[in-house]
Curated annotation (Swiss-Prot):
<dbReference type="InterPro" id="IPR031157">
    <property type="entry name" value="G_TR_CS"/>
</dbReference>
<dbReference type="InterPro" id="IPR005225">
    <property type="entry name" value="Small_GTP-bd"/>
</dbReference>
<dbReference type="Pfam" id="PF00009">
    <property type="entry name" value="GTP_EFTU"/>
</dbReference>
<dbReference type="GO" id="GO:0005829">
    <property type="term" value="C:cytosol"/>
</dbReference>
<keyword id="KW-0378">Hydrolase</keyword>
<feature type="binding site">
    <location>
        <begin position="81"/>
        <end position="85"/>
    </location>
    <ligand>
        <name>GTP</name>
    </ligand>
</feature>
<dbReference type="InterPro" id="IPR041709">
    <property type="entry name" value="EF-Tu_GTP-bd"/>
</dbReference>
<dbReference type="InterPro" id="IPR004160">
    <property type="entry name" value="Transl_elong_EFTu/EF1A_C"/>
</dbReference>
<feature type="region of interest" description="G5">
    <location>
        <begin position="174"/>
        <end position="176"/>
    </location>
</feature>
<protein>
    <recommendedName>
        <fullName>Elongation factor Tu</fullName>
        <ecNumber>3.6.5.3</ecNumber>
    </recommendedName>
</protein>
<feature type="domain" description="tr-type G">
    <location>
        <begin position="10"/>
        <end position="204"/>
    </location>
</feature>
<keyword id="KW-0963">Cytoplasm</keyword>
<feature type="region of interest" description="G1">
    <location>
        <begin position="19"/>
        <end position="26"/>
    </location>
</feature>
<feature type="binding site">
    <location>
        <position position="26"/>
    </location>
    <ligand>
        <name>Mg(2+)</name>
    </ligand>
</feature>
<keyword id="KW-0547">Nucleotide-binding</keyword>
<keyword id="KW-0479">Metal-binding</keyword>
<keyword id="KW-0648">Protein biosynthesis</keyword>
Amino acid sequence: MAKEKFDRSKEHANIGTIGHVDHGKTTLTAAIATVLAKNGDTVAQSYDMIDNAPEEKERGITINTSHIEYQTDKRHYAHVDCPGHADYVKNMITGAAQMDGGILVVSAADGPMPQTREHILLSRNVGVPALVVFLNKADMVDDEELLELVEMEVRDLLSEYDFPGDDVPVIVGSALKALEGDAEYEQKILDLMQAVDDYIPTPERDSDKPFMMPVEDVFSITGRGTVATGRVERGQIKVGEEVEIIGITEESMKTTVTGVEMFRKLLDYAEAGDNIGALLRGVAREDVQRGQVLAAPGSITPHTKFKADVYVLSKDEGGRHTPFFTNYRPQFYFRTTDVTGVVNLPEGTEMVMPGDNVEMTVELIAPIAIEDGTRFSIREGGRTVGSGVVTEIQQ
């Protein structure tokens, strides 16, 4: 079947649902697609279709990020349903890194929970520009005052992490009722999407910068070659252009992009913000891996040593309970992958306590494509214990 071309007439934004486990992120995602489908351009998605990663059926928790698309009158949205469970923060980091804005889902019956805070912090650290709040399960709360109290709590929490808590739109509703077709609650979903349209800024596309795409996944298509998938972080890539594969390995490798597709539709080019698959000429499946980037030749280089400003999570935020010292060896999570590195603290700083801000030097065991301003998380045993930004490349 010939693939149809992708329509670019509307502005495009990547958004996602974040929040504590079981507060209703996936139900809300299904409700948005279902309610918008009644208005035309969107294909309805059932809860099961979105909650479709294999592991989670056993545990009833969302593990992988699901991508769905829908449209409002103003925009075309690609929506990621971010995992909400602490064990799966790794995916949350990959997911949140793909957001021009987020919908923070908080159960009105429960109020903000530990992962609510963690996801707000992660959103701040991975540079999500704006959040809109959906107070879910409002049908289970009879007390108006309780709703107001929860809303105040959420606003305070957002302000604590440098989001404008007083200005953030808060929509009160019930995703489940909307999904069941209750007209009053369907309207709340439309109100939410209106808020997303109005409040989440049109993404400043980095289309004019040199091309770069972090590789999320790689697979082979028999007879066609190797495809790398990911979200274009900046620039444009046209079919026939040359790219470098950078990071993890000592040697970078050049190749030509022979095809680009998005949502199973073929494109002549892709630009910043697009989730794409890039077909690479003459590249074996094992030559590309998650954690590398595809980039315009010469535009970004692999490095192992850099200075960074780091915030170390406090114990209450789910961070370490004890201080760390020079020669601490955690994992540094860049874009899509963890790389072990050794920490060197500045002279006069003997140790770093949970909750501290610190400038440190890091030396990675494998080279990664980085530059000033590149963000990362610090993790140990799958748990986020800090986050930082590269301030100076050293080698």
